[in-house]
């Protein structure tokens, strides 16, 4: 890439952005203005953002007109360090013509690994088993104790079949699954690469032994998984969500787990985040993680560099590597 034609200022919204990303920006002429608050303070951001050329948004607080107004008319671009952008007011960016980037794609392998971990942990009752140990309540003399669901010979269903779902499906090719099915608005042309079958939403619910949610949160998908959906699933099924908590009606999920409508759930995302320690979801058959699907050193650095390169491309008048619109 060519160097930017002049020095430019970049607001970094979080002090823990990967060092290689900061070094890349600085090597190309950026003055980095780093917010120091953890969690990020909106007041600090609003104080430091006026006059910057770019914003590197590395957290999930709302990114909207208030931030853009505070930045000023000289703002040239913004990139989030995230795959999902449900916290961004995209129409506001489009109205103003401000380039917006994000970091999908590079997260797929880390999230896929974690999703399979959740399938196993929830399907085999890891959390409940650990709880029994802590209570000295092992029941190994009971044949049906901790009876779980295994991946072998199971129907694996995906809601959404983009990069993350396909990375999971690729990993499952050697797990002797019965079949892989998925639901999206239209069939994916490359689904044959994963021996996957496009099905209706109802068929996905009815046939899946493991149902993995890996789709964006939109008005169409919000609370797509509710009581009506859970009632169509097998009683032995395992529900896994690595997308966004908002795709699930958590009250209905709690009821489905309490009533035995489904067997278990593995969640890396919830609403809200952090999930309160007194949440009823923590008292039913679950394996819940604190939204850590991308939390590996390799993936975090890759996300950081991609966000930085999105900004550099826009500053240099080139298309962003991963534009959000």
Cite the ranges covered by each PLM segment.
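An N-terminal-biased, well-structured beta-alpha scaffold segment characteristic
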Residues: 2-101, 226
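Rossmann-like dinucleotide/phosphate-binding beta-alpha-beta segment
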Residues: 5-6, 27, 144-235
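Redox-cofactor binding/interface segments in oxidoreductases and associated redox assembly factors
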Residues: 12, 56-57, 80, 212-213, ...
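Short loop/helix-cap segments at secondary-structure boundaries that form the rim of catalytic
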Residues: 21-27, 88-95, 187-194, 276-283
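A short, aliphatic-rich alpha-helical micro-motif
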Residues: 46-50, 68, 72, 151, ...
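Short glycine-/small-residue-rich Rossmann-like dinucleotide-binding loops
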Residues: 59-60, 83, 209, 215-217, ...
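Phosphate-binding beta-alpha-beta segment of Rossmann-like dinucleotide-binding domains, i.e.
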Residues: 98, 104-155, 167-170, 175
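Rossmann-like dinucleotide-binding domain for NAD(H)/NADP(H)
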Residues: 100, 173, 227, 236-238, ...
